[in-house]
């Protein structure tokens, strides 16, 4: 398992192109506290995704912040990204590991018990549970799991993979960070609350500070 700092996953979605060029958004987050970046595009062509991923990777070069690609192992491989984030309907993590290699970061989405059980046997480096709350960033057919559901799924993951970082995603704003971290999250994934904020740099920094404070408060 590769060591992944999952405290703040800034998720750069293609729909944010109306805010600013995606590489600019990624760099702003990388310079102000994001510990991992995820590029997501549910509708773009493969060529567009590879070009965008390469541009983001170039923009954040030298920051030390890794870039993972949502869903697409082929795009991760072609763009030279640091890894991939996979959902239940995507390529399985074992196959992705064979293609991308041992040093690649592989993350998994966990929405329910079946996903958690699947993750237990997969060569993944982190898992992200969600959606935890309602979100405006994505049409989600699944009901939010809430804090209680998050706690249950996290416990299953930690039982089987005690060293795996577990994050939370969906509807997480600054006010919800303390509760999510207190419930056991090792970090959070954020889209709108960072990238549609009036000041992206400040929003990223504020999230990072809130996460670090909540993690410190959780220590025994």
UniProtKB/Swiss-Prot annotation:
Mg(2+) binds at residues 71, 90. One of its GO terms (cellular component) is cytoplasm. This is Thiamine-phosphate synthase. It comes from the Bacteria. 2-[(2R,5Z)-2-carboxy-4-methylthiazol-5(2H)-ylidene]ethyl phosphate binds at residues 135-137, 171, 191-192. Pathway: Cofactor biosynthesis; thiamine diphosphate biosynthesis; thiamine phosphate from 4-amino-2-methyl-5-diphosphomethylpyrimidine and 4-methyl-5-(2-phosphoethyl)-thiazole: step 1/1. Belongs to the thiamine-phosphate synthase family. It comes from Agrobacterium fabrum (strain C58 / ATCC 33970).
């Amino acid at each position: 398992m590769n060591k992944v700092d999952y405290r703040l996953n800034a998720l750069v979605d293609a729909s944010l192109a109306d805010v600013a060029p995606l590489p600019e958004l990624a760099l702003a987050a990388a310079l102000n506290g994001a510990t991992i970046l995820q590029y997501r595009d549910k509708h773009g062509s493969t060529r567009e995704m590879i070009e965008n991923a390469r541009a983001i990777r170039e923009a954040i070069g030298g920051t030390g912040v890794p870039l993972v690609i949502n869903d697409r192992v082929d795009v991760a491989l072609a763009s030279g990204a640091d890894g991939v984030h996979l959902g239940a309907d995507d390529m399985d993590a074992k196959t992705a590991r064979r293609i991308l290699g041992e040093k690649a970061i592989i993350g998994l989405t966990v929405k329910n018990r079946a996903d958690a059980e699947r993750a237990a046997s997969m060569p993944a480096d982190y898992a992200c549970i969600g959606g935890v709350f309602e979100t405006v960033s994505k049409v989600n057919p699944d009901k939010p799991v809430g804090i209680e559901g998050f706690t249950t799924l996290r416990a299953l993951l930690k039982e089987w993979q005690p060293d795996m970082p577990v994050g939370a995603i969906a509807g997480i704003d600054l006010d919800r960070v303390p509760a999510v971290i207190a419930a056991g999250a090792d970090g959070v994934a954020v889209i709108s609350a960072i990238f549609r904020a009036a000041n992206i740099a400040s929003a990223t920094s504020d999230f990072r500070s809130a996460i670090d404070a909540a993690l410190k408060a959780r220590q025994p």
